[in-house]
């Protein structure tokens, strides 16, 4: 089940000078087909670096049955039953439970309990919890000229700036979730459109900001003066304290809350990140699968973003930062995991005390993209997260950023294709043509990019045993199967969701009709084959 490996520290994606801050329920197959064979090796244990490790506290993640969507009631029931059984069996005092984005819990464990859990075949992996901290907030010149240059830049293809910002939409009917230090809902920038979701620091319903970072991010997404989507609804999800500190488990809890509570067209902003974390990556990936578009800060280490979480999550939109001259910000991470660049240096926005502040970081670039995602979701509220990503990338301006360090050269653009003249950066991608699968006949040589989907179908009679197998090649593709309609990221009957391309869906007794198959690129893939047998 692990889609990625390793685990390191997490920091905020805020940077100043050289410092870092940086459906309906799915049908369940016969239980015998869902059983995981007991592993002869103990579950993977990932320890945090000593300086940020939280002693004896661990995130325990369960093996998830293949044909159970994380958005289904069965997933929540499965998780709660697993927690109840394990806590009783091993005398564990559970601190919190994750039952929407990932299936697991957080608890303080003795060495004996840790050993017992690692030997339990129901456990997928265990990750030590760790401290997450923001570096001290440092302001730039609050009186700088052309303070809203970021907005000015994203509505035009080329420099120089024209000192105006225009958009085809304003985010009406869309909700943006800010997973951060909270939001000052009373700030004049928000005009009553901002509410608290949940506070995972104080464990209450008041996600007010006493740090500033979250309010600044929210202001760039949807502030009336400094925001991209000026009528979007904002929901603060507080996972970091007044001092900017928190934990990986707290951030996962925030992601889990969004996956459980988001409804309608939604986007989530995560202007935080750091070293690799399997649990955090899995939570974000699953939340995207539930239908929420996630915008992720690339990070501020001037390094390869693929080495950071959640920046490396392929189904999110990973954002690098630029300056007002269209250069990559010196602090911005880079590489193949970056999907788009956006203004991030010297960005003015709302502050927790009711005022305003100018700060820098991929933390500031990311909410520009979240705002544009809200505009595109208002344009078409039925688009999936992968389609939102495709729109952002295909509409972005090409070849404008200098010193990309091997990243895609795409600069965020807020308007629609109809307004971009001859410089649209290419047409929207179209899905691969749908094709019929014949029993025993493989379709080979399949390839695709991250987020790209391809559709196939199988027509069967009632009572047959159907197996759809994907295999071979390189990269990482995911297999989806659904009866009667094409699968989506949050509506399917089977989704093995394993690392690599070797995945199988089995239906013991088919219904009469058409089963639809979808292959989605978790990352770029090639040389893959698919075959149905019935």
Curated annotation (Swiss-Prot):
Gene Ontology MF term list: serine-type endopeptidase activity
Q: Which residues form the Inhibitor I9 domain?
A: 57-134
Can you tell me which residues form the catalytic site? Answer: 180, 213, 363
Leader sequence segment: 1-21
Any chance you could tell me the propeptide residue ranges?
A: 22-141
EC number from the UniProt entry = 3.4.21.-
Gene Ontology BP annotations: proteolysis
Q: Which UniProt keywords apply?
A: Hydrolase, Protease, Serine protease, Signal, Zymogen
Positions of the Peptidase S8 domain: 148-419
The record's section on CDD domains has: Peptidases_S8_PCSK9_ProteinaseK_like
Which portions of the sequence form the region Disordered?
423-442
Choose one Gene Ontology CC annotation of this protein and give it.
Answer: extracellular space
What InterPro entries does UniProt report for this protein, alphabetically? PCSK9_ProteinaseK-like (IPR034193), Peptidase_C_arc/bac (IPR007280), Peptidase_S8/S53_dom (IPR000209), Peptidase_S8/S53_dom_sf (IPR036852), Peptidase_S8_Asp-AS (IPR023827), Peptidase_S8_His-AS (IPR022398), Peptidase_S8_Ser-AS (IPR023828), Peptidase_S8_subtilisin-like (IPR050131)
> Sorted alphabetically, which PANTHER family does this protein's record hold?
CEREVISIN-RELATED (PTHR43806:SF11), PEPTIDASE S8 (PTHR43806)
Q: Which family does it belong to?
A: Belongs to the peptidase S8 family.
Name this protein carries in UniProt: Alkaline serine exoprotease A
Query: What species does this protein belong to?
Result: Vibrio alginolyticus
């Amino acid at each position: 089940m692990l889609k990625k490996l390793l685990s390191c520290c997490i920091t905020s994606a805020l940077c100043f000078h050289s410092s870092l801050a940086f459906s309906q329920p799915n049908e369940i197959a016969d239980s015998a087909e869902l059983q995981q064979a007991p592993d002869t090796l103990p579950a993977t244990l990932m320890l945090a670096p000593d300086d940020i490790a939280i002693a004896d506290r661990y995130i325990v993640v369960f093996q998830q049955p293949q044909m159970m969507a994380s958005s289904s009631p069965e997933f929540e029931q499965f998780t709660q039953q697993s927690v109840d059984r394990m806590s009783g069996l091993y005398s564990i005092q559970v601190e919190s439970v994750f039952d929407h984005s990932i299936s697991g819990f957080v608890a303080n464990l003795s060495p004996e309990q840790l050993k017992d859990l690692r030997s339990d075949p129901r456990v997928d992996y265990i990750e030590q919890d760790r401290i997450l901290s923001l570096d001290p907030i440092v302001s730039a010149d609050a009186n700088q000229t052309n303070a809203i240059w970021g907005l000015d830049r994203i509505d035009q293809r080329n420099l120089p700036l024209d000192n105006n910002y225009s958009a085809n939409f304003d985010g009406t009917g869309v909700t943006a979730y800010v997973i951060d230090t909270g939001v000052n809902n009373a700030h004049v920038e928000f005009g009553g459109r901002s509410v608290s979701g949940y506070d995972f620091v104080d464990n209450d319903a008041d996600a007010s900001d006493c740090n500033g970072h979250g309010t600044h991010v929210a202001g760039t997404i949807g502030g009336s003066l400094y925001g991209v989507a000026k009528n979007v609804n904002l929901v603060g999800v507080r996972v970091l304290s007044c001092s900017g500190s928190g934990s990986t488990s707290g951030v996962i809890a925030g992601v889990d809350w969004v996956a459980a509570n988001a409804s309608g067209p939604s986007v989530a902003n995560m202007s935080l990140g750091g070293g690799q974390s399997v649990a955090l990556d899995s939570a974000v990936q699953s939340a995207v699968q539930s239908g929420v578009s996630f915008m992720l800060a690339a990070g501020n280490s001037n390094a390869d973003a693929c080495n950071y979480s959640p920046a490396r999550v392929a189904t999110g939109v990973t954002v690098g930062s630029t300056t007002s001259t269209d250069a990559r910000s010196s602090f911005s991470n880079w590489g193949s995991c970056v999907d788009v660049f956006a203004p991030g240096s010297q960005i003015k926005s709302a502050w927790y005390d009711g005022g305003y502040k100018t700060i820098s970081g991929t933390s500031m670039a990311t909410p520009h993209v979240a705002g544009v995602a809200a505009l595109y979701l208002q344009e078409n509220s039925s688009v999936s997260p992968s389609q939102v990503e495709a729109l952002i990338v295909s509409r972005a301006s090409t070849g404008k950023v200098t010193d990309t360090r091997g990243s895609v050269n795409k600069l965020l653009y807020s308007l629609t294709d109809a307004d971009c003249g001859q410089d649209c950066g290419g047409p929207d991608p179209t899905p691969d043509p749908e094709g019929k699968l014949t029993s025993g006949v493989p379709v080979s040589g399949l390839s695709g990019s991250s987020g790209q989907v391809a559709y196939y179908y199988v027509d069967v009679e009632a009572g047959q045993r159907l197996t759809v197998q994907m295999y071979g090649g390189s990269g990482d593709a995911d297999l989806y199967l659904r009866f009667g309609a094409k699968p989506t990221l949050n509506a399917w009957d089977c989704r093995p969701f394993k690392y690599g391309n070797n995945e199988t869906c089995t239906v013991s007794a088919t219904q009469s009709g058409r089963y639809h198959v979808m292959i989605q690129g978790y990352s770029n893939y090639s040389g893959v084959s698919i075959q149905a047998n019935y």
